[in-house]
Amino acid sequence: MKFKSLITTTLALGVLASTGANFNNNEASAAAKPLDKSSSSLHHGYSKVHVPYAITVNGTSQNILSSLTFNKNQNISYKDLEDRVKSVLKSDRGISDIDLRLSKQAKYTVYFKNGTKKVIDLKAGIYTADLINTSEIKAININVDTKKQVEDKKKDKANYQVPYTITVNGTSQNILSNLTFNKNQNISYKDLEDKVKSVLESNRGITDVDLRLSKQAKYTVNFKNGTKKVIDLKSGIYTANLINSSDIKSININVDTKKHIENKAKRNYQVPYSINLNGTSTNILSNLSFSNKPWTNYKNLTSQIKSVLKHDRGISEQDLKYAKKAYYTVYFKNGGKRILQLNSKNYTANLVHAKDVKRIEITVKTGTKAKADRYVPYTIAVNGTSTPILSDLKFTGDPRVGYKDISKKVKSVLKHDRGIGERELKYAKKATYTVHFKNGTKKVININSNISQLNLLYVQDIKKIDIDVKTGTKAKADSYVPYTIAVNGTSTPILSKLKISNKQLISYKYLNDKVKSVLKSERGISDLDLKFAKQAKYTVYFKNGKKQVVNLKSDIFTPNLFSAKDIKKIDIDVKQYTKSKKNK
């Protein structure tokens, strides 16, 4: 005890001595300069540091317009930094953890402002205990070589195909594909079961939950030596034996999803729920419905929660992704509760019965909206003629935007500024827009293409957008088509012509309306007269020598579209009944 007391006293004296020295230094520095409030915990997180990064995959580098964002003067570990690096590799280049594990090389280099650098292996999984101050990082370069070793490529080429069949409720289905293994690969029954479950879900839509609730679920492995082994898909028990893939002849999968008689009675379970959005709760008159399948897993329950959030409050997956809070609480009748994050992809294998749930409370706190709108200048060139545009493209809300969103805005201004609609764009010779970035790069997008790019870009990185459309139309806005009218065999010369717009392709329905209009104005023949006429038709003569006869009394038209410039002339022929016949 005396020895312990002596050590404690010695340590205390040492601390007091060092503290006294520090007091003097701190007093001197405090007198020299004011307190830096940015380092205070009260102000922590309000200022950000943006660290530029580059990604090189298989020797090819890509310009990254965005940056890694950290809190200013934040001390982070190499583990946290690695998670951020893996995140941008996944989002920007689609490289997952598995790809990194199987890659030839995966590393990133941290460049510090003092001129030093540190190289970290992404495959090692070993981290130093050192912390880095985010304000000291100058840049980060990520380098991944996904090329496999030569021996791995040889292995991949030697695949072994195993045929399989699926029988559900006594009905068998021909499967054209096979289960694929590496030749002479030793696999466990657990791995084999995972493959069987995968094809059950992809081919027949049978999930793990369906298997658990099924009456029977098994598969039979038939070996080339004539033996076979039956495995229960519901047991979850696996032997330690390994199978050589080349010894398997075929696999038969058999599932009986029919419920027992006691489960056949249909019952609809209703679970009340409430939604709290940004601190404001609303009364929900409807309930979550669990019909026929009262047992559910948390993944399906989360999908139902997201559905009612979208339906009741208009909150989409995107809104949830950027929300400050997004979770729901399941209250059970036994007094227990469970909180689940809506943005989490990790679900427990537990099943929940609807009758055990008392209520569900959904809580969402959305992020603040963007304080300022963003504007991008644009130009429109139609058939080589460009006009100055005084307004800009306006982007509101999320600072990131996809090419699909830009295409919608481009179509909108084409319609508003130049009267060019979807139909004109569809038949245009050329319809593109070029996005010019501030870093000097550019990207040309076809307006008529179905853009499937998932890349998002920051509006602030766009310098301007040039829209270019070539419609192939001539300067004349309208075509004038000569026509004749013959009533009861008597034709009269018509000095005027049918005026038809060149701005778009026309249909026979459109032409019908034009013909009926001139019949009424020139000969006083109304729609009612045409209805009771013995014959009412017109013939369209095209410049290529073809012709088309159209019945004016019919409301059925061919879906063909054509240009007014292709019409040579139109002959209209109407034969009316005599008055005596008409009165009968």
Swiss-Prot record:
Disulphide bridges, residue numbers: none
Domain of life of the source: Bacteria
Main location: membrane
Gene3D superfamilies in the cross-refs: 3.10.20.120
Keywords, comma-separated and alphabetical: Cell membrane, Membrane, Repeat, Signal
Localization (cell): Cell membrane
Any single Pfam family the record assigns to this protein: MAP
InterPro entries per record: MAP_dom
CC annotations in GO: plasma membrane
Segment forming the signal sequence: 1-30
Mapped MAP repeat ranges: 45-154, 156-265, 266-374, 375-474, 475-584
Function text: Binds various plasma and ECM-proteins.
The protein's name: 65 kDa membrane protein
Organism of origin: Staphylococcus aureus (strain Newman)
